[in-house]
Amino acid sequence: MCAEATTLDELIKALDDAVSGPADKDRSCMRELLLPEARLSPISKHPDGIYAPHTLTLDEWTEAVRKRGHDVLTEHQVKVKAETYGHLAHLWSTYELRLQPDGPPTVRGINSIQAVFDGKRWRILEILWQVETPDQPIPEKYLP
C-alpha cells in the first residue's frame, strides 16, 4: 500500500521510498505521488557544452531506470528546505544515491520539487534535478 502524503515530510519520505529499490520495481506508489501531468527533468550537459533539462513522463523515467539496470538503488534526501503558500510548495532538497542501503553515496545532487496540496494530500507536479559534478560541487549551504 502506498503512503498518502498529508505533510511535506511524508511526501519526501514517500518519494525516497518510491524511487528506491530494484530497477524493475513496481512504480505504482510513484504514480500515486505524482499528478497525472507531472514531469521529471534531469539537467545534463549536452555535447555542445550547453546545460539543459531532459523532460520525462513517469513512464519514460521508469523505462530509463529499468534499462539502466541495477540490483538496488537507495535515494535519501539529506537536507530539505520547504517554502509554502496556500496549496503550493517548493522543496529544495539535497539527495544522495547509494547502491547499498548502508553503503557510501555514489551520487549526490539537488532536487527542485514543485508540489500541490489538493485538500487531502501533497502531490508532485515537477521534479527538476542536477547531479553534482567535480566542476559543480554542491555548495556547503545545501549540505547537512
Language-model-detected regions and their locations in the chain:
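Short, low-complexity N-terminal intrinsically disordered segments enriched in polar/charged residues
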Residues: M1-L33, Y142-P144
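Hydrophobic pocket/interface hotspot
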Residues: L15, M30, A38, L91, ...
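Short beta-strand edge/turn micro-motifs at domain boundaries
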Residues: R108-P137
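Surface-exposed, charged secondary-structure patches
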Residues: R39-D102
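A short, polar/proline- and glycine-enriched secondary-structure boundary/capping micro-motif
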Residues: Y51-P53, D102-P105, T133-K141
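Short beta-strand segments enriched in hydrophobic/aromatic residues
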Residues: V19, L34, Y95-L97, L128-W129
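Residues that flank catalytic or metal-binding motifs in active/ligand-binding sites
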Residues: L34-P36, V78, G109-N111
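Non-catalytic cap/lid and distal C-terminal segments of serine-dependent acyl enzymes
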Residues: D24, T74, V107-I110, P137, ...
